[in-house]
Amino acid sequence: MYNRPRMWDGQRILTSSKKPSITKKSYTLFLKPDKKVSPAKVGQVLSSHFTGTKYSSYGKWKGGYRPINVPTDVESHILHVPKEYAAIQWLTMASPANSVYLPFYTNIIDTSSQYKVDGDYQDPTNTKSAYWTYKTTAMVIEAYKHKKFIDSSTGKKTDLIYKDVNPTKKAVTKQLKANLAQSDKVAKTLSGDKLTAYLTEQNQKNADYAQKKWQTMNNSLIVHSNKLAPVTKSKLTFNK
């Protein structure tokens, strides 16, 4: 039962017209998706924890099935090879459900600084590290994913995902797609060393932009999580 429910979840997202059952003992190996698959759709599959179903590990987790996305994920990536050129690696660090897929051109001369792993970047207190920026989000969400608090701006109950993560993820993804479309246009006018230098520069700009937004969001997460932390009441006793 380790992998079958995860196969069901992937097929549920890509071929919902088939209406598969999570309790099936076998699944068709090859299926044609209902619609053309985009990097975003693949990301939806890789980020899924039975999202939007009664089996969600962020809900009642009926059945206790292991999801595709788990809190201990280290990274997730999608290799995208457009017809016009190759290639783009969509990379997210830590748990993809609470992170964002960044488009990285592969025809480059250097790796974005926050993704270089050496001694300093293995330190969880290092704010320059992309991994620890996104891992911080995953750790806070995992601790409080089942708890709600009153949103002071609306007076309604909400949780950390809907209040902080989802809006940030949506805004950052939209901006990254716009950045990619613009840099694609410029890249078509370049070649050789100028092209690779430009693509390397764009990767760094996107990495810096997304990480800054995520660090700002993490600050908000920590503030809001304080509202969810349990308060322990103790009774004091005194010797007479």
Predicted ranges, named:
Residues 1-240:
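C-terminus-biased signal that marks the final domain/tail of proteins
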